[in-house]
Regions:
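Fungal secretory targeting signals
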Residues: 1-36, 332-334
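Primary mode marks residue(s) on the alpha4-beta5-alpha5 output face of response regulator receiver
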Residues: 35-60, 65-191, 198-334
Length: 334
């Protein structure tokens, strides 16, 4: 089997790490399988809701950026709800909702913050994993990462969160986990979700290792991975050197996390399993839906806020120099 270095890896890899990668990739080559991918051009809304962690609330969640089905509201629970919406995804059979903490930048030394423009959101399924046993179940909800992690040692290792400058040589990260030098192209994030599920309880878990085994009583499903590209070149044209003028709505890069509620049609979810079996190829997921002529928009515009400062006020926070807010109480994982 020939070694194929994935596009997302080879364009950010320094020469000093190439040999290590080749050795690791050689051992994993026999495990590498096919994958599929869904792209969304941009979020259709930023909003201070979190249907998984704070269902129904408009005052407990920090600001998130939402991609996918616009049927999502603060109380969304099911695949059927999402499948009634309009999606920005390039596969009409994917009416899932994906969200992550809004990435913010400051151009005035922290006095104000605004969302960083998103160049592209991509949801990869099963990239580099072994074949899935079962489809992603209807109504599945998942969270990857930990919104409470304020230091690197508190991060969930299996989520494998990364921040780097796409196509640029590897550079040290700053004290907050972001690149310490401005990006010549996109600021990119990667985040892996659990790939094991109990189809009865819908509880999820990670395998014991990449390409390894699921916990007892669980089956493997196509693994979801977020790949989000942000474009800072217009809003911060001079870049930066040292501490990046960037943060997440939850804090530093260490609190990176993502949320997902499955909205794939049952037919398409079943068809996705077959795309994980052929070695090292992209395969499209087919289904019975055709692209709608619609534009995703906020389904509940009268509730919640999309402005960062207003979201901070809604949470009852106070501004601090380091991150723009400090919690009076420890928030649940989001």
């Amino acid at each position: 089997m020939s070694l194929i270095i994935p596009f997302f890896t080879r364009h950010r890899m320094s020469l000093s790490t190439m040999n290590t990668f080749i050795l690791s990739a050689s051992m994993l080559a026999s495990l590498a399988s096919a994958y599929t991918q869904v792209n969304v051009a941009k979020p259709f809304m930023e909003k201070n809701i979190d249907p998984i962690v704070f269902p129904g609330s408009f005052s407990k969640s920090h600001l998130h950026s939402f991609f996918g089905s616009d049927a999502v509201v603060a109380s969304t629970k099911s695949s059927a709800e999402l499948q009634a919406g309009c999606t920005g995804a390039d596969n009409p059979n994917d009416l899932s909702i994906y969200w992550a903490p809004t990435v913010l930048y400051t151009a005035d030394s922290g006095k104000t913050y605004a969302p960083v423009p998103v160049a592209r959101f991509s949801a990869y399924y099963n990239l580099g994993e072994t074949p899935a046993e079962i489809p992603i179940p209807q109504d599945l909800q998942m969270v990857a990462g930990d919104a409470n992690a304020m230091t690197k040692d508190k991060m969930i290792a299996s989520a494998a969160s990364e921040w780097f400058c796409e196509n640029d040589p590897a550079s040290p990260l700053d004290v907050n986990g972001f690149p310490s030098k401005g990006c010549s192209s996109h600021l990119q994030q990667l985040l892996f979700f659990p790939q094991c599920v109990d189809p009865t309880t819908l509880k999820t878990a990670y395998k014991d290792r990449r390409g390894g085994a699921c916990p007892a009583g669980m089956k493997s499903m196509p693994q979801l991975r977020f790949s989000i590209r942000y474009d800072l070149r217009k809003v911060l044209p001079k870049g930066w050197s040292g501490t990046a003028p960037v943060k997440l709505a939850c804090g530093p890069a260490f609190c990176s996390h993502g949320d997902f509620i499955n909205g794939w049609t049952e037919e398409a979810a079943t068809n996705m399993v077959a795309t994980t079996k052929e070695k090292q190829h992209f395969l499209p997921v087919t289904g019975g839906l055709k692209q709608k002529n619609c534009t995703p928009k906020d389904a509940d515009p009268k509730h919640g806020v999309s402005d960062y400062a207003q979201s901070v006020a809604a949470m009852g926070k106070r501004e601090v120099a380091a991150w723009g807010w400090e919690s009076r109480t420890r928030l649940p994982r989001a």
